Amino acid sequence: MRKLRVAALSISAAACGPGTEVARGPEVVTDTIGDTIVVHTVSGSVWGSDATLTPELSIGEMDGPDEYLFGSVASIAVDDDRNVHVLDRQGQYIRSFNVDAQYVRSWGRRGEGPGELANAAAMAVFADGRILVRDHGNNRVQVFGPGDAPPEEWGYNSGNYGSSEPLWTDRESRTYVVAPDLSQPFGARDNIYIVFDPDGVVRDTLRQPHAGFRQAVVRAEGGGATVIRSVPFSPRVISVMHPDGGFVSGISSDYSIDRDLPDGVLRIERVYVPVRVSPRQADQEREEAERMIGMSIPGWQWDGPPIPETKPPITGLYVGLGGRLWVRVSTEGREVENPDHEPGNPFSSAVRWEAPLRFDVFEADGTYLGAVNPPEDFSVYPPPVFNGDEVWAVSRDELDIQRVVRYRIALESQP
């Protein structure tokens, strides 16, 4: 039998003075369908207002000691003691800093030998102090530490596949390494996840959720060339690993996110207002695709699926170290002048489209806390690290200097 209840949560007013208006919590509909628990937020939030992220400290300088100069930050990891570890793609090494942003030590260097990195792109840390680095250039996970322990190498067949996905680990010290399914034909390969136990032994291989789903594409053929390009704003699969194990996933066109549980599924949903795609932006996306594909197939014109009139509600998923879910949602774009425009370059546009970042934040049980609007210099690449009310992320200033910044959630209604 289907069970349904409506719950209206409220924020305590114990600290409020007379006449203070108390914000109500979210209106939530819960449902149980088979082994799936659905938590559907209709309106409201626990916080009662939007939040932002305020910087607490930063690591990185334009000039100064080499330890504080970053070339290109590829990955960030934060351990249980709140030490932060930074993987530099340009230098192919890791620098570790304590909770006060003071440099502690470095790990690795460019190369192919033990303890060396060739094309490292993602990093994670274990509770015992070990640092793990996914290095598809060397076809292995490189393991450093704890302390001065000799490095270890956990080999796997990367298929020379470089991915921007994080290196996932869980509370049982299992490691999930993304790789292509080499049993499938080239150009149509799904991602798989190779599961290592804490000692580096492969124990399982998992398929990405919704593996049969295919994003809409335009396909052009001519002169012996084949070019495939995704249709802008078309739905796609988004999935991440939860620190308790299991996937958190969804199709971006639906505000419906499934978290795998040992005995079922927790489905998190929220009412949303669709965000339109500006016709001007759709035209620009189509023209850019025609120019790019035209480099390989001269004269090609768009003949694929239309660009959607609305953006998918979800553009990214992130799970915090404590299990909170951060959902990056679509926002309306605006035209801005392209400061890097090259008038003589036909592939350089005079304007570009920008959309502000915005996250919906849920507790691990699906309770909607509220929305977070990060500052303009906040970047989602590499993926930030979320830990309770703290967030570690890369910021770039007007001179394009990278810094790793620790932020804290603050309600925008607070003085």
Model-inferred region functions:
Residues 1-14:
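Sec-dependent bacterial lipoprotein signal peptides
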Residues 16-415:
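Eukaryotic scaffold repeat domains enriched in small/polar residues
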